[in-house]
Curated annotation (Swiss-Prot):
This is Histidine--tRNA ligase. Its EC number is 6.1.1.21. The keyword Aminoacyl-tRNA synthetase applies. Belongs to the class-II aminoacyl-tRNA synthetase family. One of its GO terms (cellular component) is cytoplasm.
Length: 427
């Protein structure tokens, strides 16, 4: 058997991980501006944490979860999404306590797992960045969170982003609409796909966002959920729309958008862009005011979103957005002979301790091969160190782009490399 990675996974090689690190660090800097703090939860949870919160009839639970019984016969699942684990942690660690400032804002990033058909931007192990905000039912919280995602895309340079917006209302509005949708779809049941025929019995709202052609035709004239919002839900949604307008964030009302998870209420949204002629959702979320209670906590309004890192990277590449990656070496030390081996190690360590990125040759190669390595690493400067340099204590530092050079002492390099590099870059 040939040993290779499982289907639907990928190896992140150094040339790729540099992009990921940039996006992750950029994310942290944006979220920090909005006063979000990082939370980390296990990558596996008890099965019920996901099944009961996400919804027993959702595709995630019925088709996509990686679940198993461990050696203690506990039913475990690899996490398929980030919200339920964070809510579980919020309740278990009593973060609803009065001494925790509200709204309590958390972000996370890490791997998720779903058994799906692998394709561009969709893997069985994928990585998600998400935020969860607890303790505010103010529609301004909805808008701030959406605006934070918009701000993130804007600063990252992603173009042609479209915001789709809808409201699922409160439980009473949703129940009224659910019945209206059942009444509309029941006469059309035989025209629906097999999955949607099942959804009609279990969770009819899920028929609305089916990707099957026959289902799309069937729901073309379906009633709009906005017609079933009660006064409370209508006021909330109108406030969200008004504040988005004031911020200059354009959006499209999409009444067929219901999101794939059962815990949402009131505002839901998706950010989409086009990749290869197809619409790709790169960020989605909404309000989930009942989930904390469902996990045994006090009544707590909440709002959040998730976005896939793989999809973000895909969009950046497709749009030709060059990330300002800092992959250059500051200096490469070419080593001439074994007599310079120990001295080269002393020097490279001293330069690193000053905060610079440095490398040296360890393979006892010819100078030409070492200089080629310096070019591959993008080294700003090259130091050639041999027995004579060790003996005299004097070395030549060359600018690897302009070929200008300065002569200095080994001691100066070990204590003030910054001044030498600055002088070299001025020439």
């Amino acid at each position: 058997m040939k040993l290779q990675k499982p289907k639907g996974t990928q190896d992140l090689l150094p040339q790729d991980s540099a992009k990921w690190q940039y996006v992750e660090n950029f994310t942290r800097s944006i979220f920090k501006q909005y006063n979000y703090a990082e939370i980390r939860t296990p990558i596996f949870e008890h099965y019920e944490v996901i099944s009961r919160s996400v919804g027993d009839t959702t595709d995630i639970v019925t088709k996509e979860m990686y679940d198993f019984y461990d050696k203690g016969e506990r039913h475990i699942t690899l996490r398929p999404e980030g919200t339920a684990p964070v809510v579980r942690s919020y309740v278990e660690n009593k973060l609803f306590a009065p001494e925790v400032q509200k709204p309590a804002k958390f972000y996370y990033m890490g791997p998720m797992f779903r058994y799906e058909r692998p394709q561009a931007g969709r893997l069985r192990q994928f990585h998600q960045i998400g935020v969860e905000c607890f303790g505010s039912n103010n529609p301004a919280t909805d808008v701030e969170t959406i605006a934070m995602a918009y701000h993130f895309f804007e600063e990252l340079g992603i173009k042609d982003i479209r915001l789709h917006l809808n409201s699922l209302g409160n439980p009473e509005s949703r129940a009224a609409y659910r019945q209206a949708l059942i009444d509309y779809l029941t006469p059309l049941k035989e025209q629906l796909s097999k999955d949607s025929q099942r959804r009609l019995e279990e969770n009819p709202l899920r028929v609305l966002d089916s990707k099957e052609k026959e289902d799309k035709v069937a729901v073309e004239n379906a009633p709009s959920i906005l017609d079933y919002l009660d006064e409370e839900s209508t006021v909330h949604f109108e406030a969200v729309r008004s504040m988005l307008d004031n911020l200059g964030i354009t959006y499209t009302i999409d009444t067929n958008m219901v999101r794939g998870l059962d815990y949402y209420n009131h505002t839901i949204f998706e950010f989409m862009t086009e990749v290869g002629g197809n619409d790709l959702t790169i960020c989605a979320g909404g309000r989930y005011d009942g989930l904390v209670t469902y996990f045994g906590g006090p009544e707590t309004p909440a709002f959040g979103f998730g976005m896939g890192i793989e999809r973000l990277i895909l969009v950046l590449e497709k749009q030709g957005i060059e990330l300002p990656l800092d992959t250059q070496l500051d200096v490469y030390i070419a080593v001439l002979g074994q007599e310079a081996n120990g001295g080269a190690l002393d020097l490279v360590q001293a330069i690193r301790k000053q905060g610079f990125r440095a490398e040296r040759d360890y393979l006892d190669r010819k100078l030409k091969a070492q200089f080629k390595s310096a070019d591959v690493f993008g080294a700003k400067a090259i130091i050639t160190l041999g027995g004579s340099e060790i003996e005299s204590g004097q070395v030549v530092v060359k600018n690897n782009q302009t070929r200008s050079q300065v002569e200095t002492s080994l001691e100066a390099l070990k204590t003030d490399f910054a001044s030498i590099l600055e002088e070299l870059e001025k020439q």
